[in-house]
Amino acid sequence: MKKILAISTKRTDAAEAMLAYLEGRMPQVQIDYAVYDDLVISFIDGKMRVSVENTGLDLADYDMVYFKSSVVHDITATYVQYALRNDVKVTDVAKGAYAGGSKLYTYGIIVPAGISVPNSLFAMPGRLVGAYDRYEQALGLPFVLKGIHASRGDVNEVIRSRDDFDRVVAVALTSDKKAYLIGQSFVPNEGDLRILVFGGEVQLVIHRQRADESTHLNNTSQGGRATIVPIEELPAEVIAASRSAATLSEIGIAGVDMVKDKETGKWYCFEVNEGPQMATGSYRQSKWNELAKYFMTELEK
């Protein structure tokens, strides 16, 4: 039997009646109905899954997905891309196109390509209330809740207890800015690398480290210190992952944030920034010099 999943922003009697009629017209076809709140995305140990909670299946188990309506563009696009990669037919392929900064969409592109990110879990705001145990089980303690659209260290909280989780979620449910959160395993580190990749090539590397242990954020916008690191000092795996992440994200002027777990030595990609503080932040002239070289190279092609 073939299986179709219909997804909409909210469940309605009219939609259920339509889907029941369609199912009756198509022998050997099962149509399941879900809303976006029913979907949970996980990136665990290098594997991406999209769980359809109300059916018990993975999105990849379906033969076709009918996106009756869309939620926030990058979230819908993440589901579309996942379906297509798993040979699931999609009624609206155009919904898979997205250009903009989104941690969730970026992870959906780079994780299947073998680039490591910290274990992560994403659910719509409607599923967050009372979900602490699930996040703790999947990610361990402490973990981080961060906004998928946030930048410069904004909307980024360490969760050490149920009270922390409930507090951050309460804010998420009352603020558009913090409405869409991804949970992520905490990575102990001694700073991170902002790797500027222009045209698929690493051009400049800046090490950023938090000012003190009162915060977990290394961003210079949050008071972190910055130091230029010679490119030749980077491990080959970090250079390769940075180039690949920028290329897969189709961002010509990218800031790839890489971090090393100081306990395990493993490298992770935090995100790929489409606006990597070129006009502001640390070492502006160094960034501008590299940007000028890149522009000239492109113009001469």
Model-identified regions with their sequence ranges:
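C-terminal active-site "lid" helix and adjoining low-complexity regulatory extension at the edge
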Residues: P230-E233, T247-I251, K260-K301
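A short glycine-rich, hydrophobically flanked beta-strand micro-motif that places a catalytic Asp/Glu
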Residues: Q184, R194, I251-K262
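Protein kinase-like catalytic core scaffold
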Residues: F143, Q203-L204, K266-E271
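Active-site nucleotide/adenylate-binding loops and adjacent lid/helix of ATP-dependent enzymes
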Residues: K2-S8, A14, A20, G24, ...
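Short glycine-rich anion-binding loops that position phosphate/pyrophosphate groups of nucleotides
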Residues: S70-V72, I148-A150, G275
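Phosphate-binding site of ATP-dependent enzymes
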Residues: D154-A240, A245
